[in-house]
């Protein structure tokens, strides 16, 4: 082998990233109190144990009806789907979702 072939090639130079500090500084200046609050925003109370139990039952029932394997991840997604449907006011013939919304 020729000695010039044995030399290692230098890695290509990386491009320097531009400084993003000004954008970060602007974001840090934003205060949540300055953001517009919607008049429909309401303060929610923490859910009761009965509401959590009912939500778990509804999520389990939903997963059984859709024949999805019951895993912690699928239970969480089913519970989030139920909560979002209730909060969005999606009509449902079941009285069970009204129980979550209004309490036991």
Swiss-Prot record:
<feature type="short sequence motif" description="Nuclear export signal">
    <location>
        <begin position="49"/>
        <end position="58"/>
    </location>
</feature>
<feature type="short sequence motif" description="Nuclear localization signal">
    <location>
        <begin position="13"/>
        <end position="20"/>
    </location>
</feature>
<keyword id="KW-0509">mRNA transport</keyword>
<feature type="compositionally biased region" description="Basic residues">
    <location>
        <begin position="10"/>
        <end position="20"/>
    </location>
</feature>
<feature type="region of interest" description="Disordered">
    <location>
        <begin position="1"/>
        <end position="48"/>
    </location>
</feature>
<keyword id="KW-0814">Transposable element</keyword>
<keyword id="KW-0963">Cytoplasm</keyword>
<keyword id="KW-0539">Nucleus</keyword>
<comment type="function">
    <text>Retroviral replication requires the nuclear export and translation of unspliced, singly-spliced and multiply-spliced derivatives of the initial genomic transcript. Rec interacts with a highly structured RNA element (RcRE) present in the viral 3'LTR and recruits the cellular nuclear export machinery. This permits export to the cytoplasm of unspliced genomic or incompletely spliced subgenomic viral transcripts.</text>
</comment>
<dbReference type="GO" id="GO:0005737">
    <property type="term" value="C:cytoplasm"/>
</dbReference>
<keyword id="KW-0694">RNA-binding</keyword>
<dbReference type="GO" id="GO:0003723">
    <property type="term" value="F:RNA binding"/>
</dbReference>
<dbReference type="Pfam" id="PF15695">
    <property type="entry name" value="HERV-K_REC"/>
</dbReference>
<keyword id="KW-0813">Transport</keyword>
<protein>
    <recommendedName>
        <fullName>Endogenous retrovirus group K member 21 Rec protein</fullName>
    </recommendedName>
</protein>
<dbReference type="GO" id="GO:0005730">
    <property type="term" value="C:nucleolus"/>
</dbReference>
<dbReference type="GO" id="GO:0051028">
    <property type="term" value="P:mRNA transport"/>
</dbReference>
<keyword id="KW-0895">ERV</keyword>
<comment type="subunit">
    <text>Forms homodimers, homotrimers, and homotetramers via a C-terminal domain. Associates with XPO1 and with ZNF145.</text>
</comment>
């Amino acid at each position: 082998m020729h000695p010039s072939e044995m030399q290692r090639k230098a890695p290509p130079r990386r491009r320097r990233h531009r400084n993003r500090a000004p954008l970060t500084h602007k974001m840090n200046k934003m205060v949540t109190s300055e953001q517009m609050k919607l008049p429909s925003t309401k303060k929610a109370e923490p859910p009761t144990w009965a509401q959590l139990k009912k939500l778990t039952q509804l999520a389990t029932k939903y997963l059984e009806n859709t024949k999805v394997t019951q895993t912690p991840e699928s239970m969480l997604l089913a519970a989030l789907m139920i909560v979002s449907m209730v909060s969005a006011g999606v009509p449902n013939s079941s009285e069970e979702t009204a129980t979550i919304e209004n309490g036991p």
